[in-house]
Amino acid sequence: MKICIVSFTKKGYELSCDIAYKLEQSAYEVEVFTKCSRLSDENIKNSTDENFRNSGYISQNISDWTAARMSEKKALIFIGACGIAVRAIASSVNNKLKDSPVIVIDELGKFVIPILSGHVGGAN
């Protein structure tokens, strides 16, 4: 399964990298992105593993970015507020049997909420 992790703060980005490393150990293909304007592409490049493909700063609108990933059938992990994820996926939700799995994790990594394609898509 191909997974995209997106964060919105530096702390969220650090958690994204930790999660990505663990998922890569389980043979998942993981991409790490952030919308945190305090992190430059150079900082992101230096702090991530070489195996994280297509990682970097998201300059486009988060809804457009999310729609593109969902059209590629990639699972999404949002690190941050559930409301951000819900708004980002809203225009791309079509069919519970075909939608990409989407989960939200708080910045501390304590709570995980599957918000789309839980049973069928594998988010649970």
Report each predicted region and the residues it spans.
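Short Gly/Thr/Asp-enriched flexible loops that form oxyanion-binding sites at enzyme active sites
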Residues: 86-99
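Active-site and donor-binding regions of nucleotide-sugar-utilizing enzymes
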Residues: 85-86, 114
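Short His-Asn-centered micro-motif
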Residues: 78-82
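N-terminal basic/disordered segments at the start of proteins
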Residues: 1-38
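N-terminal beta-loop-helix "entrance" segment that forms/cooperates
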Residues: 30-68
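Short coil/turn connectors at secondary-structure junctions
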Residues: 1-2, 28, 71-75, 97-101, ...
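Short gly/pro/ser/thr-enriched loop/turn and capping motifs at secondary-structure boundaries
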Residues: 12-13, 39-41, 108-113
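Short, glycine-/small-residue-rich phosphate/pyrophosphate-handling segment
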Residues: 110-124
